[in-house]
Swiss-Prot record:
MF annotations from Gene Ontology: 3-hydroxypropionyl-CoA dehydratase activity; crotonyl-CoA hydratase activity; delta(3)-delta(2)-enoyl-CoA isomerase activity; enoyl-CoA hydratase activity
Residue numbers binding substrate: A98, D99, I100, K101, G141
Main localization category: mitochondrion
Name of protein: Enoyl-CoA hydratase, mitochondrial
Residue numbers marked as site, Important for catalytic activity: E164
Organelle targeting peptide span: 1-27
One cellular component (GO) term of this entry: mitochondrion
Source organism of this protein record: Bos taurus
Pathway this chain belongs to: Lipid metabolism; fatty acid beta-oxidation
Subunit structure: Homohexamer; dimer of trimers.
Modification N6-acetyllysine occurs at: K101, K211
Amino acid sequence: MAALRALLPRVRAPLRPWLFCPVQRSFASSAAFEYIITAKKGRNSNVGLIQLNRPKALNALCNGLIVELNQALQAFEEDPAVGAIVLTGGEKVFAAGADIKEMQSLTFQNCYSGGFLSHWDQLTRVKKPVIAAVNGYALGGGCELAMMCDIIYAGEKAQFGQPEILIGTIPGAGGTQRLTRAVGKSLAMEMVLTGDRISAQDAKQAGLVSKIFPVETVVEEAIQCAEKIASNSKIVTAMAKESVNAAFEMTLAEGVKLEKKLFYSTFATEDRKEGMAAFVEKRKANFKDQ
């Protein structure tokens, strides 16, 4: 962990769980998580909230943390009451990267045959929208984790970076690909080749971050956005998310073709009928997720 801490300025205040009620779980196992905290938030308890909670290690993303994160994501994905998910860290650090101690003794054979980091991208397969609420440092794997989310809200003191080059390696969980798509080749290349960090303000200007808020309100703002998303039809929201994500994987012609198919598909749903009827009748739609 010394190598990890050497990449960061000194974090004086200890991390602590915040904005949480007592842990609420609807998972198959009754055992408490070790590395994360979960809760349902929002007036209708329709937002799943996950906090990375490994403060002594600056929320370094060890294998156990990723396993627990995937379990929580799956549970919220299967919960019919939850329409969106917020992922956050601590007040000083979102996540400072992968766990260097776990990586230090790995060999090429270990990584290749074992599919090292292959389970990190389960977040990208979640159909419900995921909002990252980032305070403090989102570096290395922490930055990659934030970029796997659908929306990034940042605290005004947040910093983003891919400093793997400084410890003799490169990003391995999508950093070179997602960062380039988000901010463009020149800035991504500079960040990856120098290990330099960018501020929340620079990240927003570059298109990596959607909005910036004061440190103490960023999580609550993300929850409010998630509540707004969760008030819509879950099935149509999933279609919209799939269509936007296709823009990063397909040509324009292919993406427009998929969009058209998904658009047509909404006409097979009861929620499309309800939404249009509510608009014509000048009332609020009552979606049933059907």
